């Protein structure tokens, strides 16, 4: 993103360093876990393994090579919460989520909202100082991003992916871009972050999650 752009919102300081999900299909779990930390106002990672275990159980899905539904993940956060990451660390090499031990404490819960009104809801949440999770289709160029780390009108579709919306900026020409937080580690793009245009979201995003602490 150009230094001449007008940064309207930037919530990166509210999060830990970007984590790496590795080969497991848990992007939605990572993004929702980050949002659960944010909504509880803690700058500390929460356990993805714990959340994945409960979400797969709620979904009655034993195929751990597939991703999870939004409804299962947000229900798991609302009903079971999450402990700190150190209580049940993530292992990218696992084929099956770990089973949690009993009496983990503390647990962090969030209630949720899901909407298809993507851009208007993102704007409202950012105005309120809040991050969101967006689910969208990915273009081919997602794997070859270079400076200024922007996605706009892109070709192809390599699958769906969940990320966290953490910022917004306006370019000198008036074009609006949103900052996304990925789950592919700090080596990807700009320390794990990149920018997507409003047009990109309008053409590729199909669900949005907002969450609040209990």
Annotated model-derived regions:
Residues 13-22:
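Immediate flanking context of iron-sulfur cluster ligation sites
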Residues 12-13, 54-58:
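Acidic/histidine-rich, surface-exposed loop or edge segments in extracytoplasmic proteins
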Residues 1-14:
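Non-catalytic, low-structured ubiquitin/UBL-interacting segments
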Residues 5, 23, 29, 33-37, ...:
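Predominantly the structural core of cysteine protease catalytic domains
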Residues 15, 37-52, 174:
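Phosphate-handling active-site elements
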């Amino acid at each position: 993103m150009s230094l001449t752009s007008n940064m309207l919102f930037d919530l990166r300081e509210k999060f830990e360093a970007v984590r790496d999900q590795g080969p497991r299909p848990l992007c939605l779990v990572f993004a929702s876990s980050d949002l659960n930390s944010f909504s509880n106002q803690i700058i500390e990672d929460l356990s993805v393994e714990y959340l994945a275990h409960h979400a797969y159980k709620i979904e009655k899905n034993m195929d751990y090579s597939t991703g999870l539904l939004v409804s299962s993940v947000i229900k798991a956060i609302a009903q079971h919460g999450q402990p700190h990451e150190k209580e049940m660390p993530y292992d990218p090499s696992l084929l099956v989520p770990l089973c949690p031990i009993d009496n983990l404490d503390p647990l962090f819960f969030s209630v949720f909202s899901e909407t298809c009104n993507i851009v208007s809801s993102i704007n409202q949440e950012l105005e309120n100082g809040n991050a969101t999770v967006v689910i969208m289709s990915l273009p081919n160029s997602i794997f070859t991003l270079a400076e200024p780390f922007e996605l706009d009108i892109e070709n192809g579709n390599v699958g769906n992916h969940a990320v966290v919306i953490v910022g917004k900026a306006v370019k000198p020409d008036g074009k609006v871009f949103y900052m996304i937080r990925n789950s592919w580690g700090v080596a990807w793009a700009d320390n794990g972050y990149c920018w997507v245009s409003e047009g990109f979201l309008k053409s590729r995003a199909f669900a949005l999650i907002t969450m609040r602490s209990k």
